[in-house]
Amino acid sequence: LYDVDGSSEEEDEYDVKGGLQASWQFLDFGANRKRVSAKRSTVNSVKYRIDYQRRIDEVENFYEEILEVPFNFKVIEEINLDYDNLEYAENSNELKKTWRKRLKLSALDGYASKKEINDKEKENDKLSSDSEIEIESRLSISDNLKDFFQFNSELERSDWFSIYLNTIVTQFDPHTSYLAPEAKEVFDQNISGKFQGIGARLFKRNQQVEISEVIIGGPVWRDNLLNVGDIIIAVAQSLDEEPTEISLMKLSDATDLIKGEKDTNVYLTVKRVDGGIEQVEITRDIVELAETYAKSSIIKDDTSTYGLINLPRFYVDFDDYGERNAASDIKKEILGLKSKGINGLILDLRNNGGGSLKTVVDITGFFIEKGPVVQVKSIGGRKEILRDNDPSVIWDGPLIVLVNEFSASASEILAAALQDYNRAIILGSKQTYGKGTVQNIINLNNVISGNTYGDLGSLKITTDMFYRINGGSTQLEGVKSDLVFPNRYSYIDIGEKDLENPLNWNKIDPARYDNSEKIFNYSQVILNSKNRISRNEYFSIIDQHAKHVKSKQDEKTISLEYSSYKDELENTKLQNDKLKIIEEFSSPYLFEWNEINFNSNNAYDDDMKEKRDRWIESLKNDIYVDEAMNLLKDINSIKRNDILSQITID
């Protein structure tokens, strides 16, 4: 059973927001908890206990001392952000100096933001002095650091055991990892798009577990039992059980108490937003995450109808392939769109980090007659060709595939196969992510005999590399787009090649396949699109912004003097304001939700409507989708002309 795991974690690493912002985000702990956790997975637990914890304690002891003294933003000094090449502090005094600058940078950011808001409120006489704004900025930093140290103190031996093992296994390649039982559960949830529980997302703030979102369709939503902002005080598994108070627990431990198998009950002691306290009985159920699943839109112009399918992930239930999965859903979407009489199809794989390899093979088969889809080579050199053995084709019309730098793994297999068969035009970034490896999940409980330590978790280990049917690997190189769109990452290297210890690219012999039949004039369509892009004002603005992002990334120092810092902020704001013109773009095409997705539950449909409407609106403002539509129209126009040119009149 293959799993082609995606790169969703890596995506956070490349949320480029310019050099000015990137450096202080580590202090905004509430917004970056996941990133902090990911960074810590590279820390050796032994070294942590001996050295890292000592440094953590040291910083915890002196950061408040630094923040007690007002920062002078008139002093001309700067901070070096080239952390990879910085020397370690030689002693405690040097370490403290480094932290003073880091804290000052974060305070300067808060100071500049609050001062801008304050100056705009002059007309309402809601003015604060500069010193008051500076104090408020330091207090905000202090609160964030308290959250960080609290999070650090909640880590248990099992957490550091997991970190220690991952320190070892990630030396082999970036996708081999140890999954503790809790991490394996999250992995399964992400790849299946569902879990068993109450249907609410939680977060921890000020030692309280709070509801951040009620998931549409879940038990809590169905019975209107909880609301955003409610605080869970205690948890019990039965009415007879003494509730367990959870405020001092790690959030993950509290979540474990709340989640459970379908049709079991949990009793939550809840403090409502209005202050009232009550016990709520909830029957757990399977909760589906709608944002994981495929969805589609009908696109119309004056003369034709087209379709677009968005696939966020190649989801599957590994325990039961017959359950809902990406392939079965895509098939339904295609058939639904065909019933509307579409003349072309766009398959949107942007930001799709991967998933199940079997679903990739099945989906590829919807667009080709039977044949090889991908080659898989194991560690021992054994090669296997995974094939579509079904001669039926569900969609044989014009096909466009949208990709970007975060289309990874399984997405790359699908895009590569369709490209090798000349079955689709690939539109998007210069290349996709570049993950060409296959992982298998090994349950360590089945491997280690005589285990007396409980659930040992699993090992996600890289066992194979996959290759295109033309013999090339997507490792590091990804899939090259047939037509490259400018985007904000155009001048930045993003993907597998930027990770530590990636495997090298190589190639093998091609599989036997037939790519002789094209359904459109490939070269003419591409040329037409390139000409449109070169004349398009919006794409020109995007390209200019991408160059600005690259220049900010290359900056190694930032001024800690307010006037210089403000000048840089204003320059960045000016560049961002130029990009806002893209928001004014509105496609001439008409976009509608494909109603095959409607649930039989009317209340569910009503509550999902807002999310559906937001997605449809985003398509109207998506310049990349608009150009994909232009290509589909070109394809059909050329096909019609080819047919007419072959007609003779005697």
Which residues fall in each region the model found?
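Cleft-lining beta-strand/loop regions that shape enzyme active-site pockets
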Residues: 150-157, 178-195, 204, 210-215, ...
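Conserved functional hotspot residues or short segments at active or partner-binding sites
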Residues: 111-112, 116-123, 134-143, 468-640, ...
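Heptad-repeat alpha-helical coiled-coil segments, especially the extended periplasmic coiled-coils
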Residues: 32, 36-57, 61, 65
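Well-structured core secondary-structure elements of compact alpha/beta domains
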Residues: 92-95, 99-132, 139, 208, ...
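Extended, small/polar residue-biased N-terminal targeting/export presequences
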Residues: 52-87, 142, 149-204, 265-267, ...
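A glycine-/polar-enriched beta->alpha junction
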Residues: 4-12, 19-38, 49-51
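Membrane-spanning beta-strands of outer-membrane beta-barrel proteins
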Residues: 13-15, 263
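PDZ/PDZ-like domain segments forming the peptide/carboxylate-binding groove
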Residues: 52-55, 60, 64, 68-109, ...
